[in-house]
Amino acid sequence: MALLQIAEPGQSAAPHQHRLAVGIDLGTTNSLVAAVRSGVPETLKDDKGRSILPSIVHYGEESLLVGHEARELAQQDPSNTIFSVKRMMGRSLADIQQRYPHLPYQFEASDNGLPQLMTPTGKVNPVQVSAEILKTLNARAVATLGGDLEGVVITVPAYFDDAQRAGTKDAAKLANLNVLRLLNEPTAAAIAYGLDSGQEGVIAVYDLGGGTFDISVLRLSKGVFEVLATGGDSALGGDDFDHLLADWIKEQAGYIGDLTAQQMRMVQDAATDAKIALTDADTAQIDVLNWQGIVTREQFNALIQPLVKKTLMSCRRAIKDSGIEISDTIETVMVGGSTRVPLVREMVGNYFGKEPLTSIDPDKVVAIGASIQADILVGNKPDSDMLLLDVIPLSLGIETMGGMIEKIIPRNTTIPVARAQEFTTFKDGQTAMSVHVVQGEREMVSDCRSLARFTLRGIPAMTAGAAHIRVTYQVDADGLLSVTAMEKSSNVQSSIQVKPSYGLSDNEVATMIRESMTHAQDDKDARTLAEQYVEADRVLEGLITALAIDGDTLLSKEERETLEGVMMELVQLRKGTDYRSIEQGIKKTDKASQEFASRRMDKSIRQALAGQSIDEV
């Protein structure tokens, strides 16, 4: 799915150059940046050898600190040390204060109700705070890779709405980053494990970070990730494990009453250190506020087990919402640093009935998947591994009456793109319409590639041509085509998704384009003939219906026989292949039926005006 320089198949674009691109996991608790180097995806480290950047920004009187340095000031200046800003992205101030009532920050609403945080350097909003994190990651990438970036792929939760995604893009813009794509975090994790290559089936992505829990159920089919269901808890994460352990420490130490913000931060840090130690050890030593003690893994497990069970309840709901059984999942991918906790891995494995995938560092797996996608999008993969998806390689259209194609999106249209066109019914009382999605450059369906079919049902019964069916073709940045058909008066609709490029090689694209040129005149003639067939059918269908209703009352016997004779001539011409003769037959039939049509119109007007006075008219 590389974004290539546009060139016709078989023609070379600009000479290949390695382009610098990275994947960024902009997380609630921690953020990372990764790149593919010498064919191997890896996270990029800072000058102290650290991959993880805490998603924390400290605003001081004369300085702005991001990451580890900002976290060090959290104890002494908590109100100006911004944690978990991702939770505020795209939300109103009222929403934030309702969801997170105990945040230590001073807020002020902007004119449009969005949150502004009061800092010593002035007011900042969540987008600006996120931009500082992105700037730091960008600087790390430039320093490590030795050049400016061509673009970035930034990951977002699958449930992020348009406002949250737009906020993420705005933050990247403030950081002077070119966003190639926003990639769903569960999809990035699946890509990191190579699940997008060759496998088909259902994948569960269990993402337990510091501040949030997300479960995503994905179906992988023909190279396309479809999100079947998402769930989780935006207020449950590894931080809650820390809080429980911190409360246990306070209880064991005999602390009574409220601690200061600085003391509470010290206890929290001690709890975090103990939790990390218990990942590999059975016991952990704690030394905080003049108290020393030991916590065992068994004690820690007893504290957090209710929370882990709560995540599994979310998993159960997501599985139910997706309409599958647990046994249908082929893999369970673990994401987020909190999935290192042994009890979490054990309970998740037992629930899904299989050992979860944990070979890639769960803190890094999303960033690694994003870096693989970024590397593809800037064109660093060998040509054999790419698909030309920056433009539509072949026209996308719909089959119309007569086996013809109406092109909706012409080839070489840049993506993402959305186009819509209106169609109507062919017969009186028609209540359903079959939508046949096709791909190719030829004029007839038989010479093009069939992509998908679906049926729009529930169209209100009307006379032929009265219904308005709007068909929308939308191709996203991944090359995924969504087709929606909607009847405008009733709003009934149906849709389908398809990957136009799947299973289509560059040679096949070239062949289809070449054949469209070779057969251009033949195709034009075939389409013209098909159009005359359809028009003849329309005229004959309309007259047959009209004669059945008004023929005996509005026409004399001789007039009816004359008209039916002309119609039979058209029926015979319709059996031939001379489109000019059919066209002349249609004109002759139209002329012969003009008087009948005029009488029908007069009758309709008289019926409409019956019983009304001149004033009412």
From Swiss-Prot:
GO terms for molecular function: ATP binding; ATP hydrolysis activity; ATP-dependent protein folding chaperone; unfolded protein binding. Pfam families: HSP70. GO terms for biological process: iron-sulfur cluster assembly. SUPFAM superfamilies: Actin-like ATPase domain (SSF53067), Heat shock protein 70kD (HSP70), C-terminal subdomain (SSF100934), Heat shock protein 70kD (HSP70), peptide-binding domain (SSF100920). Chaperone involved in the maturation of iron-sulfur cluster-containing proteins. Has a low intrinsic ATPase activity which is markedly stimulated by HscB. The keyword Chaperone applies. InterPro entries: ATPase_NBD, Heat_shock_70_CS, HscA_NBD, HSP70_C_sf, HSP70_peptide-bd_sf, Hsp_70_fam, ISC_FeS_clus_asmbl_HscA. PANTHER family: HEAT SHOCK PROTEIN 70KDA (PTHR19375). This is Chaperone protein HscA homolog.
